[in-house]
């Protein structure tokens, strides 16, 4: 049995962000991932957007950590972790007067969420069509917001993991946590893959287990928060007709459900989606269904009529973990054990927020931290 100072359960972008943040300290840190590869659940199956902060309710943790996380990505992590990315504006489009009114509310929300006034403007129909010539000409107005970035979330997760590995964080795949017990010394004894004896012992545990974060806390008997699922499906189109998309195009989120985008990916293909389907069984959140594909096509065509869905090359699905009580991030110590750190409810903008969430998780560990003299935070995956 290995004794670890801090054990992280979950190898998505949240877990690997925690590993990277902890890698700078003189600690024995390990990360456990149940799958063969890191980041192959929620972290892989999302839009890959570092959000500007236009959408979250200012009173929610999602807004707070969106602002903080985006700042860390741009001002710190992007300088140390080199992988493909593109700075891009967001364009939220309105097709009637009711939606146009929502643009003003979104603008006010964005300003409350610390978006600079000069980075957010309402465009009339003509200005919108100049910005996006291929957009539906029935558009009446749009809200343009500067400051988003497109990244590949799977490559970002990989870069965080490799940077952590080079600083002696241990990362294990195919290690499914099946039971956690607490011994008489208040250590967590972690059982893997239904084995009868524990493989790891730790004083501090970070629960970054995505959809199963609530199960992990419950099975450890430290907390009873509950999550549900919100599945989203995407279509990826081969851009064979030189369709130029200059921004990340959204429908008005307060009416149509946040998250549906038409955007040009880093590889030049066109991403359309996701839709939102509530309450799917956790083990079925990656499934593809025809109803969702048709819904995505309808919304995509409304935004950009010249989208050629016959050029679809693949579809994928993923799901956001939703905290049932708050519909917000859950970032705190467990109710009955301060050494168990819960990072739950990791819906959008989880990717954007991940650096700030990781820093908060380290604070919640309440450890006396000593920095490594030879910490190397830099890693380059630009060749991918």
Curated annotation (Swiss-Prot):
Subunit structure: Monomer.
Signal peptide range in chain numbering: 1-17
Function text: Catalyzes the oxidation of glycerol 3-phosphate to dihydroxyacetone phosphate (DHAP), with a reduction of O2 to H2O2. The formation of hydrogen peroxide by this enzyme is crucial for cytotoxic effects on host cells. Does not show any dehydrogenase activity with NAD(+).
Binding residue positions for FAD: 14, 33, 42-43, 47-49, 177, 346-347, 352
EC number, as in UniProt: 1.1.3.21
Enzyme class: oxidoreductase
GO CC annotation terms, alphabetical: cytoplasm; plasma membrane
PANTHER family (UniProt xref): GLYCEROL 3-PHOSPHATE OXIDASE, GLYCEROL-3-PHOSPHATE DEHYDROGENASE
Catalytic activity: sn-glycerol 3-phosphate + O2 = dihydroxyacetone phosphate + H2O2
Protein name (database record): Glycerol 3-phosphate oxidase
Molecular-function GO term, any one: oxidoreductase activity
Lipidation (S-diacylglycerol cysteine): 18
Organism the protein comes from: Mycoplasma genitalium (strain ATCC 33530 / DSM 19775 / NCTC 10195 / G37) (Mycoplasmoides genitalium)
Biological process terms in GO annotation: glycerol catabolic process
UniProt keywords, alphabetically: Cell membrane, Cytoplasm, FAD, Flavoprotein, Glycerol metabolism, Lipoprotein, Membrane, Oxidoreductase, Palmitate, Signal, Virulence
Binding site for sn-glycerol 3-phosphate: 47, 51, 258, 320, 348
């Amino acid at each position: 049995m290995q004794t670890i100072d801090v054990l992280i359960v979950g190898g998505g972008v949240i877990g690997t962000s925690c590993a990277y943040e902890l890698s700078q300290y003189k600690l024995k840190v390990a990360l456990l991932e149940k799958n063969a590869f890191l980041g192959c659940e929620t972290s892989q199956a999302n839009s890959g957007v570092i959000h500007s902060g236009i959408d979250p309710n200012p009173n929610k943790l999602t807004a707070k950590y969106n602002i903080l996380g985006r700042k860390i990505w741009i001002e710190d992590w992007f300088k140390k972790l080199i992988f493909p990315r593109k700075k891009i504006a967001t364009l939220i489009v309105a097709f009637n007067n009711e939606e146009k009114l929502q643009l003003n509310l979104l603008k006010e929300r964005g300003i409350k969420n610390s978006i600079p006034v000069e980075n957010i403007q309402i465009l009339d129909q003509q200005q919108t069509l100049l910005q996006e010539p291929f957009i539906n000409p029935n558009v009446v107005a749009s809200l343009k917001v500067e400051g988003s970035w497109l990244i590949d979330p799977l490559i970002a997760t990989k870069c965080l993991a490799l940077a952590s590995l080079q600083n002696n964080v241990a990362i294990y795949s195919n290690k499914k946590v099946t039971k956690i017990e607490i011994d008489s010394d208040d250590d967590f004894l972690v059982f893997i893959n239904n084995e009868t004896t524990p493989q790891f012992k730790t004083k501090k545990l970070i629960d970054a287990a995505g959809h199963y974060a609530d199960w992990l806390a419950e099975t450890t008997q430290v907390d009873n928060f509950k999550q549900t699922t919100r599945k989203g499906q995407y279509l990826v189109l081969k851009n064979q007709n030189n369709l130029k998309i200059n921004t990340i195009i959204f429908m008005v989120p307060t009416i149509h459900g946040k998250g549906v985008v038409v955007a040009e990916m880093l590889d030049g293909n066109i991403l359309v989606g996701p839709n939102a389907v509530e309450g799917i069984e956790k083990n079925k959140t990656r499934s593809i269904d025809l109803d969702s594909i048709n819904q995505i096509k309808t919304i995509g065509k409304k935004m950009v009529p010249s989208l050629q869905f016959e050029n679809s090359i693949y579809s994928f699905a993923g799901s956001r973990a939703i905290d049932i009580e708050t519909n917000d991030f859950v970032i705190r110590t467990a109710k009955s054990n301060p050494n168990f750190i819960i990072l739950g409810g990791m819906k959008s903008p989880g990717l954007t927020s991940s650096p700030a969430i990781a820093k908060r998780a380290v604070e919640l560990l309440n450890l006396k931290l000593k920095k490594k003299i030879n910490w190397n935070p830099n890693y380059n995956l630009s060749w991918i």
